Amino acid sequence: MNVLAKTRVYELAKELDITSRELIDILASEFNITVKNHMSVLDEEDAELIKEIFDDEENSDEKANRSVVADEEIDASNKKVKNKKKEVKKGNKNADNESSEEEIVIEMEDTITVKALADKLKKPTTEVIKQLMFMGVMAAINQELDFNTAEKLAEKFNAVIMQKEDDTITKEIEDEDEGTEKRPPVVTVMGHVDHGKTSILDAIRKAKVTSTEAGGITQHIGAYTVNVNGEKITFLDTPGHEAFTTMRARGAQVTDIVILVVAADDGIMPQTIEAINHCKAAEVPMIVAINKIDKPAANLDRVKQELTEHNLIPEDWGGDVITVPVSAHTKEGLDTLLEMIILTAEMEELKADPERKAKGTVIEAKLDKGRGPVASLLVQNGTLKVGDSIIVGNTYGRIRAMFDDKGKNIKVAGPSIPVEILGLSEVPDAGDRFNVVKDEKTARNMADKRKEKLREKRMQSTNKVSLEDLYNQIQEGKVKELDVIVKADVQGSVEAVIQSLEKLSTDSVKVRVIHGAVGAISETDVTLAAASNAVIIGFNVRPSNNATVLAEKEGVNVRTYRVIYDALDDIKAAMVGMLEPEYKEVVLGSAEVRVVYKISSVGTIAGCYVLNGKITRDSSVRVIRDGIVIFESEISSLKRFKDDAKEVAKGYECGLSVEKFNDIKEGDIIEAFTMEEIKPKNL
């Protein structure tokens, strides 16, 4: 069956006023459409055709004769369907019986107790437990069932289980309206070590970070705000792409603009390339600050040339990347840099709604001996107030005190303002999102539920991308491209592999190299892979011990090779696996029906003689009468005398029954076949 539209079986059954089970039987017996369960999706054309046929039947005076067939033996199998259609035509006269057969739609969260499910199903608890026992699940009345178990159980009672989000969470934090008021930009400074990131931050702040911290006057809260010609800019003063990517890996996009610092006398260096790749992966606008222009060896043109090698074309070279020559030492160019930040922010049209409840991200967090859990927050929308109840990741609390970046005690903080707060129950993680909720009880309940979900997730397998599971994820629409990080021992290998991998891209599967560099596989690489759901490929290099531990923790797939072509073959094989498989039919054999047996508890058994090939238990079969295929299905049982048989060869007799088909006649030919997948040999 081709899935072209989202018409589910249970939805169509409701429209036709019949149960899902009856519709599934009708689809199989009358339309030759096989579906797995009530949640299966029907082709739009099939659904419309079925509706038209049902409408025609109800409007026809000959409806009663439609299901009449020549043989009395299949009357019983069709009687239920006919009776149901007659009841529909009569307008459901027997309302009491119909109400028990009506399909029930049940909403549940991740788990539900046996008693709660029984109440929703309107069935005795003992009956539900009995069905669970038939399913091989031994459960007490107060035991919790997961979603999959509850779904299968509900199907037996003609009910549909729908998963829902927590109502409280939905009501409290679902509002994603960005608002209409302008907000300050949030800026992160990135670049290679010793290129002057901290010096630029210090120069902008008009004071040395070390001197102010030593006196305990200024609180280091991980961010600060400056005023530029009446406009505010918030800088995250934890420079480096590690913090930037760690937050992004947690789903927190806090940065609006990135300042990429490049030393004029040093040029593009390995960590600069990493920073560039992080920015591209996060799709954050970038301003290049070419620092140390006061040095004698400064060469602006060389830096710009190296930028173009990474597809960053400066504006004065005809591109769209803003480059600003600066000197943190002499303060030259810093005003221009700040103006460019304001200009870029205006182009980005950064908006917020100060009137809504606050939400944002944790920048830093620690446990203070005297003050307890302390968290630095960046308010991204709304206004945060002292006394607000908040949910922060898996923890919660009520804000007892709030301080700005200068250590001043404040009562309120608007969008893009960094603050330090007291009052949380535990220390959150950097990158955790926070939301203000109506009261502390709500926050505590939400935190408890999040912790429970986290425990469940830890028990489940990881969902990071590996070459083995890419095909399944692409089929489910989870992965639309394969992101790769390449590390090698020499630059020539890196470039060769990147070019080769990018050439593998097709219309069906895209390969995107998000980072390539020389050196061992580091924790930074693993963090980027976790944030971008990427695979790491290494050539003649190994991951460090810390990187190995982190990769295992984050579920990042790391592959190392000695030969480049082995890696290309593996990537290509994974991509080939993503292509839609093709199938060919292989006929296994055929058998002639010599005698037909009717068994009330089983159905129709065909006594057959295998004419050629073989009949196997797991094969599909088609029933052929007078050269015409009248039905296709699976073998429900295959016996040789009284014993179950896996297969029966040519020249032997057997007994078999066909799934959902009882109209077998003497002289019919049973043809067994399988569908074999033809694996694509190339892209």
Swiss-Prot record:
PROSITE patterns: G_TR_2, IF2. Residues 237-240 are annotated as: G3. Signal peptide: none annotated. Gene3D superfamilies: 1.10.10.2480, P-loop containing nucleotide triphosphate hydrolases, Translation factors, Translation initiation factor IF- 2, domain 3. It comes from the Bacteria. One of its GO terms (cellular component) is cytosol. CDD domains: IF2_eIF5B, IF2_mtIF2_II, mtIF2_IVc. Coiled coil: none annotated. The keyword Translocase does not apply. One of the essential components for the initiation of protein synthesis. Protects formylmethionyl-tRNA from spontaneous hydrolysis and promotes its binding to the 30S ribosomal subunits. Also involved in the hydrolysis of GTP during the formation of the 70S ribosomal complex. This is Translation initiation factor IF-2. The lineage of its organism: Bacteria, Bacillati, Bacillota, Clostridia, Eubacteriales.
